[in-house]
Amino acid sequence: MSGRTLLSVFVGTLLLGVAAAADARDHRACSTARAAGEWGYTKTGTLVLPTGATLFASVGRFSLGPDGVMEGENNGSVGGHVSKDVLKGTFEVNPDCTGAMTIEVYDESGNLLRTIAMALVFVDDGRAARGIVTSLVLPNGASLPSIITADAKRLHRDYGNRGWSR
């Protein structure tokens, strides 16, 4: 092979390697640590109470820590009754960008109101997440049927700016 041909093969191979590395970076696996940061979200849906179905909505902000700890606060409405709630929980994110979260919801006095389990999927390279409530349990142990979905967007990747939470 001539020097020119060898140089062409070398440059071509190098360019293919760089392109493959760039492609690999674009498809990084998701993880609990990569999800860490500050998030804003909305949840909407329906709760099935013993007295009948009622609408549910909330908007809030939460922190996800690289250690799988979640905390935040929200303003929620159940059937038009608005309250401010404190959120504490845990989460995990799988390499395929699915995940799970368990959230304990407290009133401002520290009384447990409910415990929620959610199934999650992180999208848009970890800049957003979608979720659905898979379980809602009251403090007395009673399960409450619900159809509630969530939409969250990352505010920023910084973790530790939690002065707004309790």
Q: Where are each of the predicted segments found?
A:
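N-terminal secretory signal peptides that target proteins for export/translocation
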Residues: M1-R4
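Bacterial N-terminal signal peptides
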Residues: S8-G17
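Mature soluble binding/inhibitory domains
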Residues: A22-R166
